[in-house]
Amino acid sequence: MGNLKSLVLLALLFSFSVAVFANTSNDATHDEVKPSTEATHAIEAQKHDGKPQIAEAQVEANDPVVEPQQDWGGRGGCRWGCCGGWWRGRCRYCCRSQAEASEVVETVEPNDVEPQQGGRGGGGGGGGGRGGCRWGCCGGWWRGRCRYCCRSQAEASEVVETVEPNDVEPQQGGRGGGGGGGGGRGGCRWGCCGGWWRGRCRYCCRSQAEASEVVETVEPNDVEPQQGGRGGGGGGGGGRGGCRWGCCGGWWRGRCRYCCRSQAEANEVVETVEAQQAKP
């Protein structure tokens, strides 16, 4: 009996030892596999913090670079001209070079220009400063037509305040008649380098060199041979700008750059202006 009790005690001790060893091994395995809660939070924080920094860097890289407005006048406030849109009479994107400016001019379609609406002026040709638009021209010019007409009187007034008086030479002459000296030059000292409205030049040449440059760019074939006089006395063609059916384009030194080819074309121009004037 004594030997039997001893064997039972040894068996119990062995079983207890095996159970304790198994529990110790399981605890060690769990400690190696599972990371601590603090380490997990630290890793997630690093992942989230990295995304805003990358997004901010991308936004800064995509920001457009706009050249500061350097001047004002026929070039839209840019050195070589405006190659982008307009906002309140200021260019959003200035041409970087003369080559880029020339490329933009070649791609300007007639439909890109808002239909000219006609000025409210009368008598003394008050609409000249309005550039053929109801409230004035707030953008650039192309072939004697405004690229962007002011949308309201307030916008036009804001543009007028930013234009320096020296940018446009005061109109000096009349509309011709008798021996009106300035009539042939459109009321300007060196000639008219812009469009016309009611017999007055919209933009006077700054110098003789600028006037000569404009003359060289006008192709003779673009202008129908002038058939009438420049006014004065009872010159029949004077009122039509020296054209049989009227002038459908710009003017230069009192002569039309593009004459209407037919009475129908002349009527179409008149109807367009009258329709725009009738709008509220």
From Swiss-Prot:
Residues 163-184, 218-239 are annotated as: Disordered. The keyword Repeat applies. This is Late embryogenesis abundant protein M17. Keywords: Glycoprotein, Repeat, Signal. Induction: Induced by cold stress. Glycans are attached at N23. One of its GO terms (biological process) is embryo development ending in seed dormancy. Residues 1-22 form the signal peptide. It comes from the Eukaryota. Residues 173-184, 228-239 have a biased composition (Gly residues).
